[in-house]
Amino acid sequence: MSGQTEQGKGQPLSFRRYKDGDHAPGAWQQEIFDADHSHKCPTYIQSTPPCQGSCPAGEDIRGYLNIVRGIEKPPAGTTWQEYAFRRLTDANPFPSVMGRVCPAPCESGCNRNQVEDTVGINSVEHCLGDYGIANKIAYPKPAATTGKRVAVIGAGPAGLACAYQLAKMGHEVTIFDDHAELGGMMRYGIPGFRTPRAILDAEIQRILDLGIKTHLNCRIGTDITMDEINASFHAVFLGMGAQSGRPLPVPGATAPNVVTATSFLRAFNDGRMRHVGKRVVVVGGQTVSGATIGYDTSILTLDLP
């Protein structure tokens, strides 16, 4: 490519980022912010992909999708499924559960929405999670321990994920929960037809196999005090979760037999709810109301704006 100078002589135009003798690229970030025409030069800047930036769990979505697509090859002796599974579970120890119940904000942020349709990230996560369970893939234990003891209060997804990350670092973790089983809202809020209990149990057991201790049916303030916990542990993680429903701000919201969906689901999963009326009205049309409807086929749904 050539251009004309003021003297009318043609001189070659170059868009190279390197001068002769240079061995390192220059920093162009500031120029990109200062001048909108700088994008015409082939400059590459590392940034978080929109799918990954939309993931509350912080999964390396681009990483495990590259493995699934065959762009990044697994090491010798490792299947691509296991390699992708381990990349996925670096951040999230519940791929099989999340592949079933996550609302998938990553897919809303997917670049492919601008071309045709989103990449089925949630389905890939589901598949890799089930592969890990079917092939009994275990998490590697840390090579050394730190000698630090951490108490995790609450055995829901936050508490279990925290215990998982701490155990990988070599800390000694003990979980306290006032329920008979681990899982929190994954067990007592999400119905079994959405999260099969065998799947949930398998993913929880894989975390416990890292050497995590549990104290179930143990209520803080009744069975053990915070002073006792603080005296026995170097750190405490509070992961009680958001387990209370919010009633509608309308007259009659506190009338008899008017309950929040979370209260209904908890009572049903606890085994305390034996009978449901012949006609039930569910206000709302999202995932929680759908889970509630799944427990009874003779239900009238009223969806309010």
List each language-model region with its residue ranges:
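Redox-cofactor binding/interface segments in oxidoreductases and associated redox assembly factors
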Residues: 238-239, 260, 282
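A short, gly/pro- and small-residue-rich
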Residues: 249-266
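Ferredoxin-type iron-sulfur electron-transfer modules and their immediate structural context
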Residues: 1-149, 197, 236-254, 273
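N-terminal Rossmann-like dinucleotide/flavin-binding domain of flavoprotein oxidoreductases
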Residues: 82-92, 124, 186-234
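Glycine-rich FAD pyrophosphate-binding loop
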Residues: 171-187
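Rossmann-like dinucleotide/flavin-binding elements
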Residues: 152-176, 216-230, 244-246, 263-305
